[in-house]
C-alpha cells in the first residue's frame, strides 16, 4: 500500500475566498491527498467541502505557518499551495518568508497563486 501525498493549503485573509473556491472546484482531486491547513483556512475549506479530511494546525500568525514549515523540513508535507496576498502588509511576514524559503530549500512543488495551483493540481491528479 502506498502512502498518500500530503499537501498543505494556506491562504492569507484576502485570498481565503479564492482558496475555498479552488478547493470546491478540485474537491475530488484533493480527496486523494492527506491535507494539512492553517486553522482558519482549514475551517473555511471544511465548511465548503465537508467530504475532505483536513488536519488543522494553528492560524498562520499564531504559529501555523511555522508548524507547516517544520512538516516540510521533516519531509511529511510534499506539496505547498499558499495563496499569498502581495498587496497587504502582514505582521507575520517573516514566517511567510521562512515557509516559502523551506519550500524552496526542500525543493517541493509550491504554488503561491491560483493560476499556478490550477496547473499543479492537474499535474498531481
From Swiss-Prot:
Alphabetical list of PROSITE patterns matching this protein: METHYLGLYOXAL_SYNTH, MGS
Lineage of origin: Bacteria, Pseudomonadati, Pseudomonadota, Alphaproteobacteria, Hyphomicrobiales
UniProt GO MF annotations: methylglyoxal synthase activity
Catalytic activity line of the entry: dihydroxyacetone phosphate = methylglyoxal + phosphate
Catalytic machinery residues: 65
HAMAP family: Methylglyoxal_synth
Name of the featured protein: Methylglyoxal synthase
UniProt organism field: Brucella anthropi (strain ATCC 49188 / DSM 6882 / CCUG 24695 / JCM 21032 / LMG 3331 / NBRC 15819 / NCTC 12168 / Alc 37) (Ochrobactrum anthropi)
Listed Gene3D superfamilies: Methylglyoxal synthase-like domain
Amino acid at each position: 500500500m502506498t502512502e498518500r501525498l500530503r499537501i498543505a493549503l494556506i491562504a492569507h485573509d484576502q485570498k481565503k475566498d479564492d482558496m475555498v473556491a479552488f478547493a470546491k472546484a478540485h474537491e475530488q482531486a484533493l480527496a486523494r491527498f492527506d491535507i494539512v491547513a492553517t486553522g482558519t483556512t482549514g475551517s473555511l475549506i471544511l465548511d465548503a467541502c465537508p467530504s475532505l479530511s483536513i488536519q488543522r494546525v494553528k492560524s498562520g500568525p499564531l504559529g501555523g505557518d511555522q508548524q507547516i514549515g517544520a512538516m516540510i523540513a521533516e519531509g511529511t508535507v510534499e506539496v505547498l499551495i499558499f495563496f499569498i496576498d502581495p498587496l497587504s502588509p502582514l505582521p507575520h511576514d517573516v514566517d511567510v518568508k521562512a515557509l516559502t524559503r523551506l519550500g524552496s530549500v526542500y525543493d517541493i512543488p509550491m504554488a503561491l497563486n491560483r493560476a499556478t495551483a490550477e496547473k499543479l493540481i492537474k499535474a498531481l491528479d
